[in-house]
C-alpha cells in the first residue's frame, strides 16, 4: 500500500511515526512521498525530536529532497505536482477542508483521499462520507474522498453508539477538556476569529468552540439535533478528556453502563476503546493509540442522566485511526 502525506505538522508527523512503528512488526505500508512548504532540515529535526512523544529510535536526516530515517529514504517536496501511484493521500495540512478542493489530488493521480479533519462547506454527504473507525467505517462504499472526522468525534462516537443502541439517547452535552493546539497563541496576540484564543495558551484555561458534538450526526444519523457542546482549552501539550453528559430514554444504572463499555473494549471496539482501572491522569495516556480510554470510576448516573468521562491522546490516538482508515479504504 502506497501512502502520501500532505502536511507535516503535528498530525502528519504522528501519522508517519505510527506507520514506522507498525512497519517494525508488519511492513505493509510504504510512504512514497511527503509534502510540506516548510524547511525540510527543520522538519527532519522535528520528526526525530518530539516534545510530547519523545525521541524517534532511529536517526533522521534530510538530504537532497529525501527524508532519511535509518536506512529508509522517503522523497519529500515543497509542492505537489504528481500523485501517480498513490493509493491513499492523507491530507494533514489543515488547508484543504472542502471536498471540491480535495478532488485536485485525484486529478493529480491519487486513487483515494483521506482528510484528517471534518469537511467544511456544503457537500453531498453520501459522496463525501464522514467515517469514524470502529463506529461507522463499515458504511464505506468505495468513495474516493473521506473525512476521518475530528479527534474528539472519534472519542465520543464509540461511546454514543453503544449507549444509543442500549438506552436510546434523547439529548446530550459535551465538554472537551482539550490540550492547546497550533491555532492558539503562545503569547497574547490577536486571533483572526476568537478573542479568547488570542490569549496565551500555556497560561490560561480558555473556553472556545468545538464542532465535534454537532457533527456527530454525520457518523450516527439518529443523533441529529440531539447533541451540542463546547471546548475548554487547557495548558497541556497533549492528551485531552471528554466530559459527556447524556439524557437517556431509559434509566441507566452505573454498573450496566460500565459493563457495556468494558465488554465493547474486549470485543467490537477492541483497539478503539480502552478501559482505565488504575485511576491514571493525563500524562499517563501520552502515546496511547486508542480513540478513547474510559475511566469507570468517573461514570455518574442520576435517573435517566449519565455522565461519562474519557481520556484521549488527541494526536497519537487520532493518527492511528487515520492509518487504520487508510488501510481499510485501500483494501475495500
From Swiss-Prot:
InterPro entries: GlycerAld/Erythrose_P_DH, GlycerAld_3-P_DH_AS, GlycerAld_3-P_DH_cat, GlycerAld_3-P_DH_NAD(P)-bd, Glyceraldehyde-3-P_DH_1, NAD(P)-bd_dom_sf. GO terms for biological process: glucose metabolic process; glycolytic process. One of its GO terms (cellular component) is cytosol. It is found in: Cytoplasm. It catalyses: D-glyceraldehyde 3-phosphate + phosphate + NAD(+) = (2R)-3-phospho-glyceroyl phosphate + NADH + H(+). Pathway: Carbohydrate degradation; glycolysis; pyruvate from D-glyceraldehyde 3-phosphate: step 1/5. Gene3D superfamilies: Dihydrodipicolinate Reductase, domain 2 (3.30.360.10), NAD(P)-binding Rossmann-like Domain (3.40.50.720). Its EC number is 1.2.1.12. One of its GO terms (molecular function) is glyceraldehyde-3-phosphate dehydrogenase (NAD+) (phosphorylating) activity. NAD(+) binds at residues 10-11, 36, 81, 116, 314. D-glyceraldehyde 3-phosphate binds at residues 150-152, 181, 197, 210-211, 233. The active site is at residue 151. Homotetramer. This is Glyceraldehyde-3-phosphate dehydrogenase. The gene is gapA.
Amino acid at each position: 500500500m502506497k501512502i502520501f502525506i500532505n502536511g507535516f505538522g503535528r498530525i502528519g508527523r504522528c501519522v508517519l511515526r505510527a506507520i514506522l512503528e507498525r512497519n517494525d512488526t508488519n511492513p505493509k505500508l510504504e510512504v512514497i512521498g511527503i509534502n510540506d512548504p516548510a524547511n525540510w532540515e527543520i522538519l527532519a529535526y522535528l520528526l526525530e525530536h518530539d516534545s510530547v512523544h519523545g525521541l524517534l529510535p532511529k536517526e533522521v536526516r534530510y538530504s537532497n529532497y529525501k527524508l532519511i530515517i535509518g536506512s529508509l529514504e522517503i522523497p519529500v517536496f515543497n509542492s505537489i505536482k504528481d500523485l501517480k501511484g498513490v493509493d491513499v493521500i492523507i491530507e494533514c495540512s489543515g488547508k484543504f477542508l472542502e471536498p471540491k478542493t480535495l478532488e485536485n489530488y485525484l486529478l493529480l493521480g491519487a486513487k483515494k483521499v483521506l482528510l484528517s479533519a471534518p469537511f467544511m462547506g456544503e457537500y453531498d454527504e453520501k459522496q463525501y462520507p464522514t467515517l469514524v473507525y470502529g463506529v461507522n467505517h463499515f458504511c464505506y462504499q468505495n468513495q474516493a474522498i473521506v473525512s476521518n472526522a475530528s479527534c474528539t468525534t472519534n472519542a465520543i462516537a464509540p461511546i454514543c453508539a453503544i449507549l444509543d443502541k442500549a438506552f436510546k439517547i434523547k439529548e446530550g452535552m459535551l465538554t472537551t477538556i482539550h490540550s492547546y493546539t497550533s491555532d492558539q497563541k503562545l503569547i497574547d496576540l490577536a486571533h483572526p476569529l476568537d478573542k479568547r484564543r488570542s490569549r496565551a495558551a500555556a497560561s490560561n484555561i480558555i473556553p472556545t468552540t468545538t464542532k465535534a458534538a454537532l457533527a456527530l450526526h454525520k457518523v450516527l444519523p439518529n443523533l441529529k439535533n440531539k447533541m451540542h457542546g463546547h471546548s475548554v482549552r487547557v495548558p497541556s501539550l497533549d492528551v485531552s478528556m471528554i466530559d459527556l453528559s447524556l439524557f437517556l430514554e431509559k434509566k441507566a444504572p452505573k454498573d450496566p453502563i460500565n459493563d457495556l463499555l468494558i465488554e465493547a473494549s474486549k470485543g467490537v471496539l477492541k483497539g478503539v476503546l480502552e478501559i482505565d482501572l488504575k485511576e491514571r491522569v493525563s500524562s499517563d495516556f501520552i502515546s496511547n493509540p486508542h480513540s478513547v480510554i474510559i475511566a469507570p470510576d468517573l461514570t455518574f448516573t442520576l435517573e435517566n442522566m449519565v455522565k461519562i468521562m474519557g481520556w484521549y491522546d488527541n494526536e497519537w490516538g487520532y493518527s492511528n485511526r487515520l492509518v487504520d482508515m487508510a488501510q481499510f479504504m485501500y483494501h475495500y
